[in-house]
Amino acid sequence: MMKCLLVSSVEGYSGKSGIIIALGLKLREMGYEVGYFKALGVNTVKVGDRAVEEDSLITAKILGVEEDVCPVVLDRPYIDFATSVDPVVLRKAVLDRFTEVSEGKDVVIVEGSQNYRTGVAVGIDDASVAKMLSAKVLLVGKYVNDFVVDEVLAAKSAFGTMLEKVVFNQVSGYKMSYIEGIARKVLNEAGLDIVGAIPRNPVLAGLSVEEIREAVSGEYLIEPREEKMVEQVVIGAMSPQSALRYLREARNAALVTGGDRSDLLLTALEMPNVRCLILTGNLEPVQLVLTKAEERGVPVILTGHDTLTAVSRLESVFGRTRIRGEPKVGIMRELFESHVNVKTIIEYLGLD
């Protein structure tokens, strides 16, 4: 009999997709036929003449399942959507597509929407979907502060008996013992079991060079030879001597500055921890900079945005990046398998 697990979260960008990818790949490795589904998608992009849910496409591709897994996508402002759709029609679309996706599967992992409350107005919030699909629920809590415990308890009120298991994600090291002690006691009293606490990993919160190029709407002057991750951004509005100090202290840095700052760019290219250069204002550098960047394998991105706008765009996507590309998938799998009790999840689902 097919089993269903809905992975929900108390807030957006909690790491649901990464956990689903790691769990799905582990279950498949153990011999289970794994399906993937998402009822409501809000991060939509245009493919041809239709809107599709980008996050679910990426996750489905990594899991090696069919990619058309999200029957309801937000293709207009939410208030317009909520006042123009028929919840009965939406629920039927969800059930029909889930029936197709689940055929021949031992287990289907369902990804919740932005957070467990999203979709209440149209009747396909996570709790409603879990009830429709007779799913068990695994809740992900991003440990930004101690108040996440209150958020988890509020979610328990919404899900009721469907929710029994919790994973905390992106936990700072000093909070791990707190979770094992106080938080576990409080949640156990509410009928919740913490099955994992995944530590924060700066690489997972970082950006690939391609994600940086997309964020600043740039073009490559020097393309990356391999996938590199950027964890910090350094703004080059200073002398080369001052910048040197910041670049030395930065981890896997991207330098953002104008293409006319040849002295600064050449200094940055001497630093082994500089992962890419982002040149603003459509100012191309002198050939010496490009030649040296090519020699050292440092990608160079040119954008029409000014430095402030480029940095603002990067700040808006740091920590909200997707788990894609072999390096991130590998790290997420290792963290998941080291810090989450997979056996307990399997028993929770009733898988043989």
Curated annotation (Swiss-Prot):
Organism: Archaeoglobus fulgidus (strain ATCC 49558 / DSM 4304 / JCM 9628 / NBRC 100126 / VC-16)
Protein name: Uncharacterized protein AF_1212
Entry similarity comment: To Synechocystis PCC 6803 slr0039.
UniProt-listed SUPFAM superfamilies: HprK N-terminal domain-like (SSF75138), P-loop containing nucleoside triphosphate hydrolases (SSF52540)
